[in-house]
Design a protein with these regions (language model features):
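Flexible, glycine-rich phosphate/dinucleotide-binding loops
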Residues: 154, 215, 353
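Surface-exposed flexible segments
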Residues: 78-82, 221-224, 357-363
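Generic N-terminal targeting/processing segments that precede catalytic cores or assembly contacts
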Residues: 1-158, 162-164
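N-terminal charge/polar-biased segments
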Residues: 1-13, 27, 31-34, 135-136, ...
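A structural signal for small-residue-enriched, beta-sheet-centric alpha/beta enzyme cores
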Residues: 8, 164-170, 175-194, 198-324, ...
Length: 370
């Protein structure tokens, strides 16, 4: 809800690309125009989307789906996402990016260097939906699918893509296929309600985590029910202040280094639109431990935290820098909430457990007992 109004859902660029590809494949194999197309998203919600700007020929069809972001602020709102599908002599479905879809130029991202920046889930959606159409028409030949975004190169300048090493356009993204509107106050209010419920039920200690990565780690590496944790999204600072106001005795934060490293720089809202200081902070910690010259410059240019950690291992500074980072996060959390116990545990998808602040293990034991 926002100002008493129920917020409207949207759909991702990945859903648009998959729907456009499905519609183009249907028209190519049927020889008829299709004005709308149904798409089942990974979230389980079915969409019926209008098909726009149809160009139909015997061996190739091009069409578009217009991006609807719902009530979420999004630079791709109303952008046309195109798919062109053509028959090929080779068996199988090949997916590529065309105009306005970025190309990966640095390692460490969802797709390999040289590939179109169409992430894994959208690729699977495109593949599955085109295969569905092929099965419907009994087609066993090959298809070449090209996703394009005519405005993509211009839009990409407003994103972090150029810095991440994605050049020439936007990324085709989405894990659920659905865009859920982000009303900041609504999210903070939800966090407050959940924390108040925990406190009123008698909990003195609480576990926080930013989101799905943290929940997966809590379950897989620690054997704790993820429902034990309160999800903070990017609002870590707000969540800590709410914990203090409600009278919790202690708070443990478990999260991916890509989020929690920002706390060392005093960034309490970790959304990328407020800035991206991950490599700056890691490089500063590394410099304090002796990293200098070309290696420091290389770290500043790393795309992901795992890339930076790999460099630290090569330089023999891995443990020292993580220890310093944990100390810095400990200082900042204590400054934020000096009257309650605070702790943090950091992990990465590639390296698993990384480091923890002083007292984090004790807090974890108390949360398990609470």
């Amino acid at each position: 809800m926002r100002d008493g109004k129920k917020l409207r859902l949207g759909y991702t660029t990945g859903s648009c690309a998959a729907a456009a590809a499905k519609a183009a494949a249907w028209m190519l194999l049927s020889g008829s125009k299709k004005e709308s197309i149904r798409l089942l998203t990974p979230k389980g919600m079915e969409l019926t989307l209008a098909v726009e700007d149809i160009h139909l020929s015997p061996n190739c069809v091009r069409c578009a789906i217009r991006k609807d972001s719902g009530d979420d602020p999004d630079i791709t709102r109303d952008t046309l996402i195109y798919a062109e599908v053509r028959k090929t002599e080779t068996v199988g479905i090949v997916i590529d990016g065309g105009q306005g879809v970025g190309r990966v130029t640095k390692p460490g991202l969802d797709q390999p260097v040289g590939a179109a920046a169409i992430n894994s889930v959208p690729r699977r959606m495109i593949q599955a939906n085109v295969e569905e159409v092929c099965g419907l028409f009994g087609y066993i030949g090959g298809l070449y699918v090209v996703i394009s975004v005519p405005d993509g190169e211009t839009l990409a300048k407003k994103t972090f893509n150029p810095r991440l090493g994605i050049e020439g356009g936007i990324s085709i993204l989405g894990t659920t296929g659905i865009v859920e509107p982000m009303s900041e106050q609504a999210l903070v209010d939800t966090i407050h309600v959940e924390l108040r419920q925990r406190r009123e039920s008698g909990a003195d200690y609480v576990l926080l985590s930013p989101g799905n990565y943290g929940a997966d780690y809590i379950k897989g590496a620690m054997g704790i029910d993820p429902a034990t944790a309160v999800m903070t999204s990017n609002f870590i600072g707000d969540a800590l202040e709410i914990c203090r106001e409600l009278g919790f005795r202690g708070v443990l934060l478990i999260g991916h280094i890509g989020k929690l490293v920002k706390l060392a720089g005093g960034m309490w809202n970790t959304h990328s639109r407020y800035g991206d200081c991950r490599m700056d902070i890691l490089t500063a910690c590394a410099a304090a431990e002796g990293l200098h010259g070309g290696a420091a410059a290389e770290m500043l240019c790393c795309v992901t935290c795992d890339d930076a950690l790999r460099l630290l291992k090569e330089q023999g500074l891995y443990d020292a820098v993580l220890h310093r980072l944990a100390g810095r996060i400990d200082d900042m959390m204590h400054y934020k909430c000096s009257d309650i116990e605070t702790g943090a545990i950091l992990f990465s998808k590639e390296y698993g457990y990384l480091c923890e602040t002083k007292g984090a293990s004790k807090l974890l034991r108390r949360i398990k007992e609470d």
